[in-house]
Design a protein with these regions (language model features):
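Transmembrane-helix bundle segments that line or gate the permeation/cavity pathway
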Residues: 51-73, 78, 87-108, 140-149, ...
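A conserved hydrophobic secondary-structure block that centers on an alpha-helix together
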Residues: 11-25, 96-151, 155-227, 235
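Central hydrophobic cores of alpha-helical transmembrane segments in multi-pass inner-membrane proteins
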Residues: 9-29, 45-55, 80-84, 100-116, ...
Length: 463
């Protein structure tokens, strides 16, 4: 019975998402009224609650071992500890998608509750973008990945959770990572709304900042915890194996880091506005690309959930439509939103822009190495792999300057800095950095890159 309730909640959320879409279109482009906006907010609340309740219904079904649900039969067992029963909910394709939806509902709830209520039309346009994401993902879950699918006759016992996943890391790593992935929906929605309004200023940048920072924090925690889990679980290949799914999780983090820096320039100097918008769109698109890679089976990965081309086609089509129309809108509105002022390279904004270049180039090299085997297979029919030698060769020379520049940029002034002042600061920074490396190398005995990585981490912290 609980399974049916959870499925009905999904159907309700899907139906209301269409109402959310049509109502947001009416308010954003045709006719605004306070009553319509209040109704739109109510729809968003109901969608959020239905998605959260649907997810909790699946968790409860796991806890009580309802093996009449195929998903639970395949991934749980009555004798499993409570922790693994609960975390088993998202240790599979269908359950993880429902967790994605629950977090999408949570972010929609928080956005509606805490955004500036005076900007009703702007918020309606942001909810217009969110409604499209709701329809796409809820529809994908209902029609291709129903987590509440029944099985008959009802088995007496389940198959149990995959032994590799029976680790406390499963309870925290995927939720943190998904909070980061899904959280980038809000900056994306903010950017679409700003393009539609043709207004991007420092107030917009200030409002969007916490919605960028929160996903970045969750992605940082999720990736770090995943690396630690991979380290002590030998089956995953060490701290970082340059696996396609690992790579694709790093891409949104790199882009959201660049987005944080770019948005800071927009907030403080009213500059790099179009670049900030573009980063928001691409960062979110990369989360959709990650979903495609994990669930399509087109790239081999120890982290992949499923190998179902039909699901892959659905996600790829959705990725194409969202990204294509977002970039078309960006191109149409570019001249109306961009009024970049020139600034000196030797300044905080110049340093942050240069840092952005390195971060985006780093992301591009990872994306190329991850998708290259797929491109070669499609064009030539040959099966190749791109391993750590490539990534170490092209990624490290880009990310090391990016990290070092971050520490320097923080200490520069806005506008122009005197060259002598810069040289003095650079000299001090370089000496401090050398002492950090020597100190860590003296304390630790390990590979050069490990020492350099720790040194850069300390460098950033001290900066």
């Amino acid at each position: 019975m609980i399974g049916e309730i959870g499925y009905i909640f999904l159907i309700f959320a899907f139906t209301l998402s269409f109402l959310q879409f049509f109502n947001s279109v009416k308010i954003s482009f045709f006719y605004f009224s306070e009553e319509s906006f209040k109704f739109l907010k109510s729809l968003t609340y109901f969608i959020s609650f239905f998605l959260l309740f649907s997810f909790f219904s699946l968790i409860i079904s796991y806890v009580i071992s309802d093996f009449s649900i195929l998903n639970i039969y395949n991934n749980s067992h009555t004798n499993k500890p409570l922790l693994y029963k609960i975390s088993g909910t998202w240790g599979n394709h269908e359950g993880s998608l429902l967790m994605w939806l629950a977090m999408l509902g949570l972010y929609g709830l928080l956005f509606t509750k805490f955004t500036n209520q005076e900007s009703s039309i702007f918020n309606s346009r942001a909810l217009f973008a969110i409604s499209i994401i709701n329809i796409g993902f809820i529809g994908f879950t209902i029609f291709t990945s129903n987590p509440f699918e029944r099985i008959t006759p009802i088995p007496l016992e389940g198959n149990g959770l995959n032994p590799v996943l029976q680790d406390p890391g499963l309870a925290f790593h995927p939720p943190l990572l998904y909070l980061g992935y899904v959280g980038l929906t809000i900056p994306f929605a903010y950017s679409i709304a700003a393009l539609l309004e043709e207004k991007i200023d420092n107030q917009w940048a200030k409002a969007i900042r916490p919605w960028i920072l929160a996903p970045w924090i969750f992605l940082t925690l999720g990736i770090s915890l995943g690396s630690f889990w991979a380290y002590y679980e030998l089956g995953w290949g060490g701290w970082w194996f340059w696996d396609p799914v690992e790579n694709i999780s790093l891409l949104p983090w790199l882009l959201s880091t660049a987005l944080l820096h770019s948005n800071r320039v927009t907030e403080k100097r009213n500059n790099l506005k179009s670049w900030t918008i573009l980063l928001s769109i691409i960062a979110f698109s990369l989360t959709l690309l990650g979903t495609f890679i994990v669930r399509s089976g087109l790239l081999t990965s120890v982290h992949a959930f499923a190998s179902d081309p039909a699901r892959g086609v659905f996600i790829l089509s959705f990725l194409f439509l969202v990204t294509f129309f977002s970039l078309i809108l960006y191109a149409l509105k570019y001249e109306k939103i961009e009024n970049n002022k020139s600034f000196h390279l030797i300044s905080k904004e110049g340093g942050l822009l240069l840092n952005n270049v390195f971060l985006c180039a780093s992301a591009a090299t990872i994306l190329l190495g991850t998708l290259w085997p797929l491109f070669v297979e499609v064009t030539t029919g040959k099966d190749i792999s791109v391993g750590s030698p490539y990534f170490k060769l092209v990624f490290l020379p880009l990310i090391i300057p990016a990290i070092y520049l971050s520490g320097i940029s923080i200490n520069l002034n806005w506008k122009l800095n005197a060259m002598q002042s810069i040289l003095d600061k650079l000299g001090k920074f370089f000496i401090i950095f050398i002492f950090i490396i020597i100190g860590i190398a003296f304390i630790l005995e390990g590979p050069v890159m490990m020492i350099l990585g720790l040194s850069l981490s300390v460098w950033l912290f001290l900066s």
